[in-house]
A protein has these predicted regions:
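Alpha-amylase-like alpha-glycosidases and glucanotransferases acting on alpha-linked glucans and related
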Residues: 1-58, 115-118
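Carbohydrate-interacting/catalytic domains
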Residues: 40-41, 55-60, 66-179
Length: 179
């Protein structure tokens, strides 16, 4: 469960955003445009949430935060899209990085797997100062789960608040509070 660097993309492989389109290929067979077609930014954001909340050091390959696509080398080394960045993805990265910075348990806390199921994963990061439960639903519909957050130190009388919610059409930083 320990890793040194949490990478979704790097200079040796196709970019993670491209991999969300489920196309395996190279530019010489499919063309560079195919790397950008059918991408799933919701899945990309789910990956970034795991990257930023898992143990280890999250490492962003330049351009991932701006929505750069690309098949395997050399296509994955496209230039940074100065002035044409995906502003929603940039904002998302800034917000999730801020959450990591503001919540020590996401940087140095213990990790505990919670409830997991088909297209669903949940785990907790916690220390003596705080607890975060991370729930990722990759289904195409809402699901209901009972998560035993007491396992990560949330008191039975405690409250939890959704601080980030990602959807197909974007994300929001406002959420409901649960008891």
């Amino acid at each position: 469960w320990q890793v040194a660097m949490n990478e979704l993309s790097n200079h040796d492989h196709s970019r993670f955003l491209t991999r969300t389109n489920h196309k395996v290929g190279r530019t010489n067979t499919l063309g560079p445009q195919a790397a950008e077609q059918g991408i799933n930014k919701a899945v990309f954001r789910e990956g970034v949430v795991i990257q930023m909340t898992w143990t280890g050091a999250p490492t962003i390959y330049y351009g991932d935060e701006a929505g750069v696509c690309g098949f395997t080398d050399p296509d994955n080394r496209r230039t940074y899209p100065w002035g044409h960045e995906d502003q929603v993805l940039l904002s998302f990265h800034k917000d999730i990085i801020r959450l990591r910075r503001e919540n020590e348990e996401l940087r140095t806390g213990s990790l505990k797997m919670l409830e997991n199921d088909y297209n669903f994963i949940s785990y907790g990061r916690f220390n003596r100062k705080g607890q975060c439960a991370i729930l990722i639903n990759n289904n195409n519909h809402p699901i209901t789960k009972e998560i035993h957050v007491w396992e990560i130190g949330v008191p039975k009388t405690g409250k939890m608040k959704v601080i980030l919610q990602s959807r197909d059409d974007g994300y929001c930083m406002e959420g409901a509070e649960y008891e």
